[in-house]
Amino acid sequence: MKLAPNLLAAMLLAQSAAAFANGSADTIFYGGPIVTVNGKNEEVQALAIQNGKIVAVGKKHDVIKAWQAPATKIVDLNGQTLVPGFIEPHVHIIVTSYLEGLGVNLSNFALPYDTIDTISTKLRAQLKNVPAGGWLFGFGVDPSRTAPFMAELTADDLDKISTDVPIFIVNQSGHIGYVNHKAIELAGLTDNTPNPGDGGIYVKDAQGKLTGKLVEPPSYLAFMAKMPAPTEAQLLGAIKNTLNSMAATGITTVSEMSVGSNFGVDREVAIYRGIFAKNASPVRVRGYLWGQALPVGYNSIKPNDGDDWLRFIGVKYISDGSTQGLTAALNNPYFYPKDSTFSGDLNYKDGEIYGLMKPFFDQGWQLSIHSNGDKAIDQTLNNFAKLLDGNPKPQDRRLRIEHFTVNNESQVTKAVKMGVVPSFTIGHVHFWGAAFNDHLIGA
């Protein structure tokens, strides 16, 4: 049975069983603390569900009297606590599924940290699993958890693993990648190839030679285009595994922040529609279309297209990179390396990103802008202010800033006044907090 994930709204409406006429509930829960999150942090004794929605909360006697029928399932919690489903505001379901289903997991969460040699050993061991014509694909390398600190793979390092098999690695941030020279060759890049735009960079050394380091997802596209695409069955299986794992942790609604970033908007929208048409997802999805994948004048999908379970509600752009990857745009230089004068880069000029955002804003789309650094946050807030100028109900537009990592008090105040919602990825602070504080940006 699917339970409606928007428990909070239902509980706010359902103040007591007496608020409803008698009915026939599908399920009634009782026997443990039932947390309503109704503003007063109240707990109730019982909860009734009908047709996948909460129809009553209140005292056990009242709920059972009003809603129990012969076919009603009665669930005794036996002291366990029932809480609203968790809402995960920022995920990349297809990206995650693609990486975890088809790539080598190189994540290292504990001491001792990896070195370039240990990472290379892990990759070398996977060569035997690469089919003819295939690529060795990995993810999760984290320079902030590599010894020495911030050590990164190069094309030369990856060539030591193989010069025949193309290798492509995405690091833990998702904003930086590494390739060997075989991959560079197959992608058709040379030392004279210009950067792809939208913030993407093919990093070169002092002599103008490609190093194998890629900055921002647009720089991945030339390589992904040459990689064997997963079959529909492989991709759907991986996506369903991801959705099921989310549900197993209590997550009932997610915001998918990159629809179209891997296989194009139309294909990824079709993938989601296919999954939900078969009732194969245990969680609800709210989709944000990947702005960089949208052609000028795109209008194939209208704002809020979908239903209660799957709805496409917004468009997302990325204004800077990752803090841990030293690519977020700051107003002051990073602490690393020592005496650095580098403060990151904006992916777009002010007028450029405003011009991309405005047509979708005018169509009624919600907008979400990835901004980690305070310089990027300034740019986004200023552009939002221009968009909202003359809008009588800015709160209806649900403008979001993703991450909002390196911020200051004036930016918080400005966001509040404008009705802009910072969407914090607090897990980043937990995971990279020590690196942020001790090495990269300070307290």
PLM region descriptions:
Residues G23-Y30, V35, G39-Y298, Y317, ...:
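Divalent metal-binding segments
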Residues W290-V296, E402-Q411:
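Short, conserved secondary-structure transition motifs
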